[in-house]
């Protein structure tokens, strides 16, 4: 599901936007492409140092939307990007947390996104 083209995009620095929602308006938080870990073709690991509102939202509604992109990854024009949808869970410990903590020592939890769809947007 997470294609070679997706991996090419996240190999360049760019911003990742994470959208979550519960009963009220959507909440958006950002991180960087370089912080992501992709352990398999349907899972994205994201370090969470803050993200308290995102976590509260996912405890009510686990669905999230992410956008990732980089102007350095050439597509038909300058840059490429993707819209990713999936389900999210925050983990404060365990093997996935340990993997993220080794890469991003500032993290207090790992946001695990199980991807259900991916669409090229740029």
Predicted regions and their residues:
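Binding-site signature for planar aromatic cofactors or substrates
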Residues: 1-122
């Amino acid at each position: 599901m997470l294609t070679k083209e997706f991996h090419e995009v996240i190999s360049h620095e760019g911003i990742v936007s994470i959208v979550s929602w519960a009963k009220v308006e959507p909440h958006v938080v950002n991180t960087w492409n370089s912080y992501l870990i992709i352990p398999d073709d349907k899972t994205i690991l994201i370090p969470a140092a803050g993200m308290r509102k995102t976590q509260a939202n996912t405890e009510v509604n686990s669905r999230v939307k992410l956008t990732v992109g980089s102007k350095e990854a050439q597509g038909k024009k300058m840059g490429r990007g993707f819209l990713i949808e999936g389900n999210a869970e925050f983990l404060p410990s365990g093997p996935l947390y340990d993997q993220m903590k080794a890469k991003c020592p500032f993290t207090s939890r790992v946001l695990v996104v199980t991807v259900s769809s991916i669409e090229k947007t740029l």
